[in-house]
Design a protein with these regions (language model features):
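OB-fold and OB-like single-stranded nucleic-acid-recognition modules
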Residues: 267-434
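TPR/TPR-like (Sel1-like) alpha-helical repeat modules
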Residues: 116, 127-141, 212, 218-240
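N-terminal leader/linker segments that initiate helical-solenoid repeat arrays
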Residues: 22-76
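Structural register within alpha-helical repeat arrays
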Residues: 40-43, 76-77, 111, 166, ...
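Short coil/turn linking the two alpha-helices of tandem helical-hairpin repeats
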Residues: 44-45, 81-85, 112-123, 175, ...
């Protein structure tokens, strides 16, 4: 994990600054116990090699454990371990420095930066880091005061570093809770970090994960979790995740979205929205596949209540297409009068004055054949709606078709007329008022 501290501290040469500080103190007051102590310390001022610093500090500590400059020595240990890349020792040294000055900027920043790199960070380490983040967030101005920051940091540099430090401490507070598996608290802290700085791909991912981890008890959080995953996967600006991580996360998002929603419908819109905004809009939701199915069933039930003929047909078709459909037809439907059904005209035979109609109830190609007791008048264009009742005579499963014998007098919706009827209708005079 890359931890960007940039302008949090201007401390790359803090060892030199501390040396100058000690030298200044040496001129002002006799803090050295004797010249031998100063001679023991002096090699630190003559090199930039942290290995020499460490060897010198160890000798100094061994020979003068109660030095009046022990607090300065602890700060030098901190910088030395940091320069050597010894994260655990730097972390512990920072804790020692904070005992001297709880607002020491360099020590606090070392702790919140190093906690990510400890392998692993134990409960005590997390407690220490939590106290550091609390101090930073509660007293940012205080820890950037001249007496607490590196001597070479200017007021302008301090002012520029404060917002970045606030964001860093805030996301670290969330990471600590996330590492403890206190996902509800982590969610709150990560959301605060996003509000402070929306351009944080890693934090967006952590926030999504913290919300998803609560899925068993709070399944309603899953859609928003998917949003933050989409944000982390699609955002490619400053502080975004590496391209390889975004690619892997995109693959995960595609799978998770499909599993949750039941299809990829709306996924591209989700990604586009997340790319442009770090947080979801008010009222944001993604319907789950279960919710969609529930709504479909409810809508179907409501439709069946208002369209009983469609409900009847659905039940009949389900019974006929079942493995025992043939038996069902022979014992329950054949030669029985089936109540009124409704379908759209597909074909008539013959086209004019037909005695046979093909209707579509569900299948647009037709799933009902009506054999009439006589010819209907004229002809009718396909697509018109016809209601009928009739006696079931036969059926086939593939293609599905049920054949009824129907009394044409009980047919509703046929609009065809014979030629003589049309002529009589057209010959009628219209009397206009005088």
């Amino acid at each position: 994990m890359r931890i960007r501290l940039s302008l949090l501290l201007k401390t790359m040469v803090i060892g030199v600054a501390l040396v100058c500080s000690i030298a200044a103190q040496d001129k002002k007051k006799p803090d050295w116990k004797d010249p031998a102590e100063y001679d023991l310390y002096k090699p630190i001022t003559q090199t930039q090699d942290p290995k020499v610093w460490l060897d010198t500090l160890d000798k100094w500590t061994k020979q003068y454990p109660q030095s009046e400059l022990a607090d300065i020595r602890r700060q030098l240990y901190l910088e030395t371990y940091r320069q050597l890349g010894r994260t655990r020792e730097a972390f512990n040294a920072a804790v020692d420095v904070l005992r001297d000055n709880p607002n020491n900027l360099f020590a606090l920043s070392t702790i919140v930066g190093s906690i990510y790199q400890l392998s692993p960070a134990g409960p005590a380490d997390l407690d220490i880091a939590e106290r550091a983040t609390t101090t930073i967030l509660a007293n940012l101005d205080g820890i950037y005061a001249k007496e607490n920051r590196p001597t070479e940091m200017s007021d302008a540099e301090a002012a520029k570093a404060k917002p970045e430090m606030r964001v860093f401490a805030q996301k670290t507070a969330g990471w600590i809770d996330w590492t403890r598996k206190d996902f509800a608290r982590a969610e709150v802290e990560f959301a605060k970090a996003i509000a402070l700085d929306p351009k944080q791909g890693q934090v967006s991912y952590w926030l999504g994960d913290a919300m998803l981890e609560q899925n068993k008890t709070n399944p309603e959080k899953q859609p928003v979790a998917l949003y933050y995953f989409a944000r982390a996967a699609s955002y490619d600006g400053p502080n975004s995740l590496p391209a390889s991580d975004r690619k892997n996360l995109t693959q995960y998002l595609n799978t998770a979205y499909l599993k949750y929603h039941g299809s990829d419908e709306g996924l591209s819109q989700l990604v586009a929205s997340a790319r442009s905004s770090a947080a979801p809009p008010s009222g944001f939701q993604i319907k789950s596949a279960a919710q969609i199915e529930k709504e479909r069933i409810e809508a179907e039930q409501m439709f069946d209540k208002t369209h009983p003929e469609r409900a009847l047909w659905k039940d009949l078709k389900a019974a006929l297409t079942a493995p025992e459909g043939d038996t069902y037809f022979e014992t329950n439907m054949k030669d029985a009068l089936v109540p009124r059904l409704k379908g759209k005209l597909v074909a008539a035979a013959p086209a004019s004055k037909p005695k046979e109609l093909v209707l579509a109830i569900e299948n647009s190609a037709g799933d009902v054949t009506l054999k009439l007791d006589g010819a209907l008048p004229g002809k009718m264009e396909p697509g018109g709606e016809i209601e009928f009742e009739g006696i079931a005579k036969s059926f086939t499963k593939d293609p599905f078709m049920v054949t009824f014998e129907t009394d044409k007098a009980k047919l509703i919706g046929w609009t065809g007329k014979n030629e003589s009827q049309k002529k009589n209708s057209s010959s009628k005079k219209t009397i206009l008022p005088e």
